[in-house]
């Protein structure tokens, strides 16, 4: 056998297919370019299954990807479409002439019922290999089965409904258990529930569907040839005792509601559309004599499951006459009718035929058509071939259908992922609303389209619909990108103009007060919207001009606050002399730059409140930048003006610790003009060190001199260390102050004496007060009576100076005695020194013949040597070599010079007159040999090389000279 039911094999033959749908979108007016201009794949694509049956196909059912077909009269073929290459062939093994009447497969694909023309029914489970007869069902020609989707599973069907050709509805339950010869039968029970009648009596039950609503109610729809019955009641229970019996018991005394149509095909068929497996069905289609009854299924309705019903007539050439429909299947937006030679698909929204698919005669007439709800595939078959339809993107053009029906919400739902189509729908909806005078809705839709902005705005202007135009502009503004600044500026400016014009028109109308308030609130919402803040900020200059041109000062201030343009707000309050409100804005937003700008204005009107605000700002303000405002304010010289300036400057100096010279200088000037008492206290608090004061000393001196504050000038002189000037000025004020100044130069006694002489001269010559002059002598020990006497006039008697002269003489006498004592002590000390020197000349050391040099370890007496008090002995040349490396460079140079001069000096000759003459001549020319030796000894033998400072300094000296180490290192390489 060839590969069976391969899903994606190329079909061996294709019939002529007519698929009609909505035309391609093309390039719409909005500016969108369709991305679907190329030819699209058809919605319904037919494919013949690569399968050639060995016998004629009599019946075929598909569910949950499981396909079952009957071949001939005695063969069943079961195929798992996921494993199509492994079909399961089952022989029924019947000897009579009974034919397969119908087959029924449940929603799980597990339970198969085979109804025979001999009124017998066979049952076969997916896991079983044998068809088992159902004894309780014998004698009933089964026409339909209503499977229990809520309770059925692979091992049991749960309670199900069975419709027969005699109009009876039975309840039954099947089990998949294999009981063997003596085991239980698969049909657990089979009992009658109801009989369906038409006008002539019982009628065959053509279709049965059982569903369960979300509220727990049960629904059963049963159809005959001309009627559609509904049974609504208590939900199906999971017990054999109740099942569907309770639901049908409610209709024992009265018939259920039904729909009836006059025409008769001799049969009918009901199809449901279920979006997903095990979900509730959404729509139904009933094929009967008058056409197809189509509608929605609404489980929430109390009295009927059916809603939005309408009858679609059969297409031309189809009907109860010569070419009746044989079967119907329902998809999301189409129902497909099976005819003997073709398949026709009809749109459930419009009733138009969108597909007319003819089949080749060689395959024979079509028998039936079924749908697999789990995959959405449609299956049609003839006696010699099987065909499958793929449904692809069925909803692709539904949006246009809904658009033509003016059902815009549904149209937008089905083209949400296609911007070009969505734009078309929105534009059509906007036009529709505009024609219906629903201008606000129209504006909202227009704002979402890509239609030309100018055309839409002009439409609203011509219709005098400013409110709708504002709505359109606002929504357009909200949809702009950050880079579209020009458009944003235009829209914000236009919106502001519209609001202002509307407010101006409503403001004077007392009957429109509520509307005015609402419009004002909308305008403020627009101005304060965070979404529009960026655009409004960019257009703030234009908007302020508009507000000013309309004279709307209220909103001008409101907008300035929103834009945080507090400078404009403060300026507005100042212009209207609302200075306290201006200060409140400054204090609330604490912007230093605004304080600097508006303080010169505010301080003239509310100085105390402004200074309080300055103090509240603390270190956030730079006091230097506020000085100009204070200077202009305090020029009037009034006490209140100066006191407020001083209050802030004192806060800066005492609390903030300001050290800026300009601030301290200005505070000095304020003290000098307004509070002289505080001036000296400030200067004294600042200290007397010229390097630590924060004011300009020269400026302070000039300022104090200009205002006649002499004590302050004296203090500044003292800080400048100009003590003579300080004393001169202090003598004009107070002698005691001058005395304080005179004692300041403690380290310069000459200057102190000079200053006290100034004071004494002043006291004697200006005040003529001898007692005070004598007191000056007592206050300054540097002054003597003889220093002061020249200042007294000649007529003054000596009685005034008696005590002073006596004291002076006593002091001189005491001083002379001290000098004598010191001289005696110096003489005694000199005698002791001479005695010590004599003793030193007599000191000596003993050198034994066996003593050796401390450096070379050779006998010491072989060469000239040095002997130190510590006991170390060195040859002269050995000591020279040991000392030389530790000497500084200048001493090493001096040592070489002495050695050179000693080498050039003539050796001494005893008893020679010529030698004495030579020494005398050499002495006349330069140092003698003895002097050179003495200098050399002083340089080399000043201390022991092992015990002296030289050894201590050599502790951190390396054992090997760095240069020598480098030479040794290179020699080994």
Swiss-Prot record:
GO biological process, one term: intracellular protein transport
GO cellular component: actin filament; autophagosome; clathrin-coated vesicle; CORVET complex; early endosome; glutamatergic synapse; HOPS complex; late endosome membrane
GO molecular-function terms, A-Z: actin binding; syntaxin binding; ubiquitin protein ligase activity; zinc ion binding
Keyword Lyase: no
Coiled coil: 454-481, 802-848
Tree of life domain: Eukaryota
InterPro entries: Clathrin_H-chain/VPS_repeat (IPR000547), Pep3_Vps18 (IPR007810)
Key words, A-Z: Acetylation, Autophagy, Coiled coil, Cytoplasmic vesicle, Endosome, Lysosome, Membrane, Metal-binding, Phosphoprotein, Protein transport, Transport, Zinc, Zinc-finger
Modified positions (Phosphoserine) in chain numbering: 3, 11, 13, 689, 912
N-acetylalanine PTM sites in chain numbering: 2
Bilayer disposition of the protein: Peripheral membrane protein
Zn-finger region bounds: RING-type: 853-947
Compartmental location: Late endosome membrane; Lysosome membrane; Early endosome; Cytoplasmic vesicle, Autophagosome
CHCR repeat ranges, renumbered to this chain: 618-772
Residue numbers bearing the N6-acetyllysine modification: 362
Pfam families referenced in this protein's UniProt entry, alphabetically: Pep3_Vps18
Function recorded in the entry: Plays a role in vesicle-mediated protein trafficking to lysosomal compartments including the endocytic membrane transport and autophagic pathways. Believed to act as a core component of the putative HOPS and CORVET endosomal tethering complexes which are proposed to be involved in the Rab5-to-Rab7 endosome conversion probably implicating MON1A/B, and via binding SNAREs and SNARE complexes to mediate tethering and docking events during SNARE-mediated membrane fusion.
Similarity annotation: Belongs to the VPS18 family.
Assembly information from the UniProt record: Core component of at least two putative endosomal tethering complexes, the homotypic fusion and vacuole protein sorting (HOPS) complex and the class C core vacuole/endosome tethering (CORVET) complex. Their common core is composed of the class C Vps proteins VPS11, VPS16, VPS18 and VPS33A, which in HOPS further associates with VPS39 and VPS41 and in CORVET with VPS8 and TGFBRAP1. Interacts with RAB5C. Interacts with HOOK1. Interacts with STX7, MON1B. Associates with adaptor protein complex 3 (AP-3) and clathrin:AP-3 complexes. Interacts with SYNPO2. Interacts with PLEKHM1.
Protein name per UniProt: Vacuolar protein sorting-associated protein 18 homolog
Organism: Mus musculus
